[in-house]
């Protein structure tokens, strides 16, 4: 099969032979019609179409040549490849994938893994002889048991790993089939196996053997995935821990189905994180890889529901439309996907404005050539160099250097600027023709305030008419000059105009007014705050304007403390009188008066309280309270304790105990 015509997603179905332990021979539920050409089958009067449909009589070599051999060529070209075996237990998934060590079976029964590795070695050897490029082949073995990944080739195969770090598992080099035999023997020895009602040697975990092909240009992978059985938990007959194994197995298979259906539907968010199995296979279950599904089905009537479920999964996976891409091309495309924010052109460029002068009213830079290219395109190209080829980067840098050389600055004389402000454009044009070319002197930079106003001051030097055309820029004087246009102080820029300029303008200069500006030292904010705090009156609440919240709270607390201390000091002389008053108030009453008061309160409670209030009296329960309320309604009220004692509700010495509890006279 030609590589250009190879489909990115291929689905194949393989019928398993009859299981001998069932002890009966029945017609198969799978039928291969003669018109199918090996690509369709009929199950339960439903026809299913796939890329390949293998009957039970097909050999391992024929299945490998038609299904897996094209993936070997794509692997060496730098593509990611994955082959999955899906189906219920006992249908030959591990047998087809070749998870059994090669030395323990006959050569005609070798599965996909040893055959693929043999072809990889042949092609790697041929390429190294021609190109002399070092190509290394590695292999890793991962088991996913109870939603926990285990590195079967590591030093601690029974310690679970973190799912996100499964790409860093142990990889052993492969140089021959003997190395693969050692890896499979080591991994199979540590893999979990448990007998079920459907298979005496059923795998209770998902196994992933990854072949890594590394070179200077790419690092490609081929994943050989042997999924656990997809049968229901009830059919296994397991309970407890074994039942939980089946639940976790079906969880991983369900996540595989969800990922495949999401990719087929074109969803932007793929649920890779729903299980550990899809998390480990995330790098291979993408739109840039080759996927091959081998659906293993059973010919027995008792397995019809599982067979239909497997075929439906293959039908949904057939809807995938992938666009495989080599690893090197993937990196280039990712580098080209620069965020739009980084592709925006800069407003200024440090390289361009490094030799430019500040823009002010005195000096305005002007380019020598007016036909220069716009800088936005150059800056745009330079800013997005991350996604450009080396030639494009070189061209962008050359354009940037060209712009730097063409952007030469020419200073405009102050005579032009002053006259343009006054409106004498024609005279300024005449003077410009009489002026000699610029002397190349660096223009003086203005003050940091970059003022646009012109200060006109008195001329202090003698008039010289012979120097009208001479370029002159007045130095900065350390005085404050009054502007003629506005009665405000401006930046300290003074200009010395020539006599010809004064004659042309007709404006006589003002008398120079020098305003002495006293320079007061600027104090720190902490010093100013401290001085303001010291100037405040002692004992008064300080002003809370422009102070920190902590300072204001501290001042309020200090003032409150002083007030409290003063009040306590004033209250000390009256302390003895207060104690004497308290002593007179707390004098205990006489026992007889207290007893009479207690009896009165008790009778008031009996005469006025309801049933709930009577229940709160110590020694009276719900029945006694109800009886007291009933007798009170009969008598009207209780006048003394003798009437209460004569009631028939007190049996034995209950009245004496009641009186002791409530401090009453018996």
Swiss-Prot record:
Residues 423-450 are annotated as: Disordered. Its main location: cytoplasm. The keyword Metal-binding does not apply. It comes from the Eukaryota. Keywords: ATP-binding, Coiled coil, Cytoplasm, Cytoskeleton, Microtubule, Motor protein, Nucleotide-binding. GO terms for biological process: distributive segregation; establishment of meiotic spindle orientation; female meiotic nuclear division; meiotic chromosome segregation; microtubule-based movement; positive regulation of microtubule polymerization; spindle assembly involved in female meiosis I. Residues 8-320 form the Kinesin motor domain. In adult female, found in meiotically active ovaries. One of its GO terms (molecular function) is ATP binding. ATP binds at residues 87-94. Residues 639-666 form a coiled coil. Gene3D superfamilies: AF1531-like domain (1.10.150.280), Kinesin motor domain (3.40.850.10). It is found in: Cytoplasm, Cytoskeleton. The keyword rRNA-binding does not apply. GO terms for cellular component: cytoplasm; kinesin complex; microtubule. The nod(DTW) mutation is a cold-sensitive recessive lethal mutation. Belongs to the TRAFAC class myosin-kinesin ATPase superfamily. Kinesin family. Required for the distributive chromosome segregation of non-exchange chromosomes during meiosis. May be a microtubule motor required to hold distributively 'paired' chromosomes at the metaphase plate until anaphase. This is Kinesin-like protein Nod. The gene is nod.
